[in-house]
């Protein structure tokens, strides 16, 4: 509980989706003393927490492509967390936790491209995600990006859970 309080105090993160990754306890992982660490990943929208880090904490949000060299086995911890996140994203619709309630297919594709660190073919992505029948297209369009506009969609969690009961498997 102390760690939860410390995390909430330092980062402002509270009531979020967190997944345990792994425990690390090799004898030689820290030259100073024996240390056991448990890692987690959390799904958050950083813009919601941009100002929540305590200034005196020396913490900052950074993009993975701007990360600095990490100490001890922390690089392995990060790699393990990214791998587990990608596995979960491939098998569960966890990405919808990071999107606004209504979103465009471009926003959804951009999210999955960020998770996987690679560009996806637009036509194939749309065919696959729409073929799952877990999205509902709204009559409303986002006209910020183009004159024609892009339809907004919502994730139909109830339909998804009903389909799970019938053996549906979410695969990206």
Task: Tell me the role of every PLM-derived stretch.
Residues 1-5:
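Short, small-residue-biased leader/transition segments that mark boundaries at the very start
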Residues 9-52, 66, 86-95, 132-136:
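Active-site segment of metal-dependent pyrophosphate-handling enzymes
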Residues 36, 55-58, 149:
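A generic structural signal for well-ordered coil/turn residues at beta-strand boundaries
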Residues 37, 70-72, 118:
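C-terminal catalytic core of Y-nucleophile DNA break-rejoin enzymes
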Residues 41-42, 50-89, 98-106, 124-133, ...:
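NUDIX/MutT-family hydrolases
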Residues 91-172:
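Core RNA-modification/binding signature centered on pseudouridine synthases
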């Amino acid at each position: 509980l102390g760690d939860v309080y410390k995390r909430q105090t330092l980062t402002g993160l509270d009531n979020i989706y967190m997944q345990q990754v792994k425990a690390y306890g090799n004898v030689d992982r820290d030259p100073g003393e024996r240390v056991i660490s448990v890692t987690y990943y959390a799904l958050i929208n950083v813009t919601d927490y941009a100002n929540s880090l305590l200034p005196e904490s020396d913490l900052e949000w950074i993009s993975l492509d701007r990360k600095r060299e990490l100490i001890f086995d922390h690089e392995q911890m990060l790699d393990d967390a990214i791998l587990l996140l990608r596995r979960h994203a491939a098998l569960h619709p966890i990405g919808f936790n990071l999107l606004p309630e209504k979103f465009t297919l471009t926003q959804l594709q951009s999210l999955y491209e960020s998770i996987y660190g690679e560009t996806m073919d637009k036509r194939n992505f749309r065919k696959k995600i729409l073929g799952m029948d877990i999205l509902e297209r709204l009559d409303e369009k986002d006209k910020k990006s183009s004159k024609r506009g892009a339809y907004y969609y919502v994730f139909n969690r109830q339909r998804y859970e009903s389909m799970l009961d019938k053996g549906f498997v979410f695969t990206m």
